[in-house]
Structure formats: structure tokens, C-alpha cells
């Protein structure tokens, strides 16, 4: 396997893509954003590097538990005692290049937000929270909020009601998304002594908290109806209404079907579509009527 293939394998490409889409949505929500396409390319470059770097550091720290879990066991074939130092150097170079590029070619505020996302994932979530508390993904989910702040700031050098709305939309969504996934890996988490919610409180109690979190998320998603300072365009609200209804349906299915793990997996996959469609709804602010 080539070095490029190995890097792709351990950098959690799906997370990087989501982070880039969040940043792009916030970027395009800025009035006049289409006049700053060069800045968008720099933002994507810097954000991608930081996200990939964070994933590598996460994998380095979790080298002791990844082989015990089916979902992550293949990473140990790439990242081991012989290759750890090399990947540490690569990850360090990535995050430094990300910071310097965004600082010089965009602005210090954007670079600070990118670095904040990196630090919250590596330090706050991976090192401090993941192995200590079942609230790991709730608090650590703040890492997913920083791309929205960086996206807006890459043009304006500031924050706004819109960028904060997008940032906390991702934050509210993360527990619903990840808890549905973790139900399917509950045995691995128990084996690895990782206190993910299903491993601590059981599947039925986890479904209860998924429903609670989803209810909060759905209510939060319609906030632009009541706060005029949040600018997300005319198409966002009808898309949010449809996706909210579908999300409630999918996350309620496990409870209706006797907590079938397949339903949790379907809810996990739909939660990806949910967030993608809401972000696309925000991007469609560019469509003028």
C-alpha cells in the first residue's frame, strides 16, 4: 500500500468531507461570498489539512484500543510502533501548514478557529474526554462547530448570528449522529473500556437520550424563523421542515421495533443525509428569487 493510500486510510476522509462542507456552507452564507472564491479554496485546503492531521493524532493516541474494535482494527495494520514516529511528523507538518496558510492568506481569526477545531478534537475529545466520561461525544462535539466559525471568518474576520447558528447546529446534531453509530459497536466499546453512552447505560436508555437530543436539535433547527439576524435563505426552512420530520421518524424506529440494531444503523446513515441537506439548504442562499 502506498504512503498516500495509508494516509487516506487513517485520516477519516468522511469526517474531513463533512467538516469541509460545514465550512463551505458558512462561507457561502456571507453576503458577497461569490467574490471570494480564492479564499474558499484556501479555506478548504487549510481545513482539510487540519482535519486529516487531527485524525492521525487521534489514531496515534488510540493505538492501544483500535486493534480491539472491528470498526478500527484495520488501522493497526498501518499505524504501529514502527510507523508511529513517521505519521506523527506528517500530522505535525499538516497542522502547521494549515495554521500558517490560513494565518497568512486568510486572517488570524480564521487560523485561530481552525486551530481551535484541531485542539478540541485531539486534546479535549481524544485525550481528555473519550476514555473518562459518557458525555465524551456531547462535549467533544464542539470540535465540529469550529469549521462554521472558520468559514464565516475567512471573509469577514469575525463571527455572526449566522455562523454561530451553523456552529451549534452541528454541535446539537453530533450526539444523535454518533450515539446511533455507537449502539452498533457497543460490544467493542465495552471490550475496550470506552464509556460511550450505550456501553454505560444500555441500548434502551441510549435511545431515550437520542430522542431527547433529537427533539432539541429539531427545535433548534427552526431558530431562523424567530431570529432575523440568522440569514440562511428562503429554501432552508422548507428543507429543514421535511428533514426534521424524517429524522424524527428514523430515530424513533428502534423504539418501535424493539431496539433493533439495524434501525439504529439506518438512523445513523440518515443523520448524515439530514445534516448534508440542511447545509445544502444554507448554501442555497445563493439562489435569488
UniProtKB/Swiss-Prot annotation:
GO terms for molecular function: protoheme IX farnesyltransferase activity. Its EC number is 2.5.1.141. One of its GO terms (biological process) is heme O biosynthetic process. It is found in: Cell membrane. InterPro entries: Protohaem_IX_farnesylTrfase (IPR006369), UbiA_prenyltransferase (IPR000537), UbiA_sf (IPR044878). It is an enzyme of class 2 (transferase). Keywords: Cell membrane, Heme biosynthesis, Membrane, Transferase, Transmembrane, Transmembrane helix. It catalyses: heme b + (2E,6E)-farnesyl diphosphate + H2O = Fe(II)-heme o + diphosphate. Pathway: Porphyrin-containing compound metabolism; heme O biosynthesis; heme O from protoheme: step 1/1. It holds the Pfam family UbiA. The keyword Transmembrane helix applies. One of its GO terms (cellular component) is plasma membrane. Its main location: membrane. Carbon 2 of the heme B porphyrin ring is defined according to the Fischer nomenclature. Belongs to the UbiA prenyltransferase family. Protoheme IX farnesyltransferase subfamily. NCBIfam families: cyoE_ctaB. Converts heme B (protoheme IX) to heme O by substitution of the vinyl group on carbon 2 of heme B porphyrin ring with a hydroxyethyl farnesyl side group. HAMAP family: CyoE_CtaB. This is Protoheme IX farnesyltransferase 2. It comes from Picrophilus torridus (strain ATCC 700027 / DSM 9790 / JCM 10055 / NBRC 100828 / KAW 2/3). The lineage of its organism: Archaea, Methanobacteriati, Thermoplasmatota, Thermoplasmata, Thermoplasmatales.
